[in-house]
Amino acid sequence: TWHSFNDYINFSDKAGWEKWWGKKWIRTDIGDYDNPGYDDLTMSLAFLPDLKTESKEVSGLPNFYSHKPDTAAKAIPGYTPRDYLTHWLSQWVRDYGIDGFRVDTAKHVEMDAWQQLKTQATAALAEWKKANPDKALDAAPFWMTGEAWGHGVMQSDYYRHGFDAMINFDYQDQAAKAATCMANIDLTWQQMADKLQSFNVLSYLSS
């Protein structure tokens, strides 16, 4: 069957699974890892391990890097899992000039972590543009949009923690009603025009 591969995995092999991420990095219900929680920030989403982005404990690199002698990842003194993740992501910006991130399931990570990522990515893009003036498309700063299920046209805390726009989940249903009668969209557009004075949303028709 589709899930038969699970029959070949020893999920209780504590020593074996410790060679994976390591307990300082993730929580998951396999091996000897800490169990996931039941809130948005510590749960195991879609059976995936939850990265301990809230941890203040110095973690070192994930254990699996010890099996990768050709890795470019280097241990950084004093870094926590969040510090490593934001460092690695912003390094892509610094190396390749990536000018924006679209964040999925933003509610499952602490707001402070998103702000840390935005701050570091913004600095990294500025460095890249300064070093590559012939490749830079514009002088705009790093841009970040995110998905938080059910978010509509409102200036939530996400905007105060690094996000320039959030996906507007309301518009899909509103546009579907307009498809039957265009007059139905008038109120929606007027409400958006009234609200979107100092912030923006990313509206979509279908995903």
What does each model-found stretch correspond to?
Residues 76-83:
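Alpha-helical scaffold elements lining the catalytic groove of polysaccharide deacetylases
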